[in-house]
Amino acid sequence: GPMGIMGPRGPPGASGAPGPQGFQGPPGEPGEPGQTGPAGARGPPGPPGKAGEDGHPGKPGRSGERGVVGPQGARGFPGTPGIPGFKGIRGHNGIDGIKGQPGAPGVKGEPGAPGARGIPGERGRVGAPGPAGARGSDGSVGPVGPAGPIGSAGPPGFPGAPGPKGEIGPVGSPGASGPAGPRGEVGIPGVSGPVGPPGNGAAGIPGVAGAPGIPGPRGIPGPVGAAGATGARGIVGEPGPAGSKAGPQGIPGPSGEEGKRGSTGEIGPAGPPGPPGIRGSPGSRGIPGADGRAGVMGIPGSRGATGPAGVRGFPGSPGNIGPAGKEGPVGIPGIDGRPGPTGPAGARNIGFPGPKGPTGDNGDKGHAGIAGARGAPGPDGNNGAQGPPQGGKGEQGPAGPPGFQGIPGPAGTAGEAGKPGERGIPGEFGIPGPAGPRGERGPPGESGAAGPTGPIGNRGPSGPAGPDGNKGEPGVVGAPGTAGPSGPSGIPGERGAAGIPGPKGEKGEPGIRRDGARGAPGAVGAPGPAGANGDRGEAGPAGPAGPAGPRGSPGERGEVGPAGPNGFAGPAGAAGQPGAKGERGTRGDGGPPGATGFPGAAGRTGPPGPSGISGPPGPPGPAGKEGIRGPRGDQGPVGRSGETGASGPPGFAGEKTPGPQGIIGAPGFIGIPGSRGERGIPGVAGSVGEPGPIGIAGPPGARGPPGAVGNPGVNGAPGEAGRDGNPGSDGPPGRGHKGERGYPGAGAPGPQGPVGPTGKHGNRGEPGPAGVVGPTGAVGPRGPSGPQGIRGDKGEPGDKGPRGIPGIKGHNGIQGIPGIAGHHGDQGAPGSVGPAGPRGPAGPSGPVGKDGRTGHPGAVGPAGIRGSQGPAGPPGPPGPPGPPGPS
């Protein structure tokens, strides 16, 4: 019929989810190039939006499972979003629609539910400890950055040979106790693994687009022209304003487990004895003095120079993993920020399709089934008589007893390839279902490979040129706006006329049966193309059971009749007994490749397979960037008291005065970290996300080739009588009885007609009761390999399997060749003097000193040298008056 009048243009809809990967259609005839319209004027900048308030930080979630790389579909043309209708039956994935105009930015959503905790990796071997670097100055604690992706564990390093015994350095004066270091988590030793892929950072908030220019007068839509030549690529637009700043800082993670105390260091050697002192003469015993007061703690001495490294000790016993810390309290849920103003509609730009992605790996070959016993060849059936054009529905017979399993017959010779069937009339469109609830945000998937290049669409008529506007200043980054309302659905187009059916092929001669050897089980074929939905017939009343008739020979294929009206679903019969296995038919030649099918629905995830054999270790990746310093940990335990030094020469007994408090000895060397503990219990899987919005159903696919005729099944039991359906609409006039068999035509196939618009969908019938389970059909010949299917969504993780049997303990490895002694590093710069440490505990009381003996009287020393004459002193004060003289 003629094309209907185009309705008014609805408001722009929200951006839909990317559709599945489309298949490349046949190239259209080149049309005349369209006229290039002048560029529109750039509108003035929009008002800046208000930034929303930041919500409270949520509870940190566990690391989610690594998503599977999904196939990236070709970027289709934007479709016009329709009004959500009732939920219809799930249709086939259709061709990508026209891309709609981008909607206004949405409001910032709540943080998603925490993802499921990943399964811990395999236990790595302990790598050789690296050389100790010079102690750097304590820097200020930086802000906690976002956690980067966890890199894969690197290959285990070989244990290094013990180094040469270092020289014993002089015992330095004890330095001041430094501040307690940050409490670190127990790290997994090993060689650094390759750098993981860069994390997908969250996209910045899109800037507010400028206000649209004054629209020109609306032109009358012209007829759709033929596909024009590919136009030149447009000029790249100016980059948008920068995104908003990063989100608020996350809650710091729980503190790591307390580190193990290092082993005590070796006792240093005794110092050389001093020169003997001059024995003094015994002095007189003095009066015992009063008890002195506690001495004042002296200023800590400067830190001694670092001595050479000592001999490496034996590795310590493997540490035990401490119990898991308690889960922190749930954070206060964040408050949704105020929605910003609705931004204007962006420009309608159609991107170019991406390059074709790589082909996925083939799946594992299934196990071969048990070969069945060889069956006797069955007799050939008689050809059935020509039946009427359309027979009435027979009465349903009772269910027969289960048959015995037949013996497979010999393989016959391959028959001639049949002519390709005629193309069926496409079915009518289904009513789009209502939009489902909004799903929770799932874990981010990895970037998919680029899909194949799609065909170039028809070029639309160019619009009138708008007035040139002044160039506006760049706008301020606005807050995300709310999504605009969905636009009204377009008027469905009229149904196109059916194509002219091609000539019918001649019937091939039956093949000669020969006894052949049983072939090996074939590989699992790819799924064939999906057939179109057949027409529904009206439900007839259930009749009494009739006897099973003899098997007739397959009749000739009739011409495709016109599509009848949509019927209502009839009642389904009760479940029948499983039928006997039929004879294996002869394998025919491969037919022509079928039409490209649409991707099937995603299958359910199977149970986890057995662990594969570990591959060889890959080459070490480049060194990662220096990580951000973590928060300062809790103060460690007080170190052990130093070992008692070697006894010096006996001194003279002193007075019994209490000495000052001793300084805590320096902590011992840190022991070698133990081996990694056993694998922890996997975390609880996160909640399943809500289903995403239902996409627009695509047009039905082309009808697939007819399948192989199966053995007739056992008659099922009569089902319950269905309800009377509504009377169907009048169908098109019939074509009469089948004519005589004509000679094959010699004309060339006509040009392919244009695809007609989608017809209206009929009313959906009420669902009938469950159908009868039919007998197992015979295995047909293997069809041609279908196109590469689109990889389905990753299923949810399965339940945890039972714990495996402990493996056999491996043999002790051969000791490696001692490595070459490394160069002695330069002496590190002395570290800065740390603050005074806490006062140590009181040391044990020393032994009670004995009373000293009286010393010898000292010898008379030599006469001293007379000193030089000093300067004259100041004049003294005047003396008192003298006595009076004699008169």
UniProtKB/Swiss-Prot annotation:
Tissue expression as described in the entry: Forms the fibrils of tendon, ligaments and bones. In bones, the fibrils are mineralized with calcium hydroxyapatite.
One of the record's GO molecular function terms: extracellular matrix structural constituent conferring tensile strength
GO-annotated biological processes: extracellular matrix organization
PTM annotation: Prolines at the third position of the tripeptide repeating unit (G-X-Y) are hydroxylated in some or all of the chains.
Subcellular localization, as worded in the UniProt entry: Secreted; Secreted, Extracellular space; Secreted, Extracellular space, Extracellular matrix
Compositional bias ranges of the Low complexity kind: 1-42, 126-155, 170-194, 221-236, 278-290, 368-388, 444-455, 473-503, 518-533, 560-580, 595-605, 658-673, 690-720, 766-782
Any Pfam family matching the protein: Collagen
Protein's UniProt keywords contain Cytoplasm: no
CC per GO annotation: collagen trimer; extracellular matrix; extracellular space
The entry's keywords: Calcium, Collagen, Extracellular matrix, Hydroxylation, Repeat, Secreted
Subunit structure of this chain's protein: Trimers of one alpha 2(I) and two alpha 1(I) chains. Interacts (via C-terminus) with TMEM131 (via PapD-L domain); the interaction is direct and is involved in assembly and TRAPPIII ER-to-Golgi transport complex-dependent secretion of collagen.
Protein name: Collagen alpha-2(I) chain
Organism: Hippopotamus amphibius (Hippopotamus)
GN (gene name): COL1A2
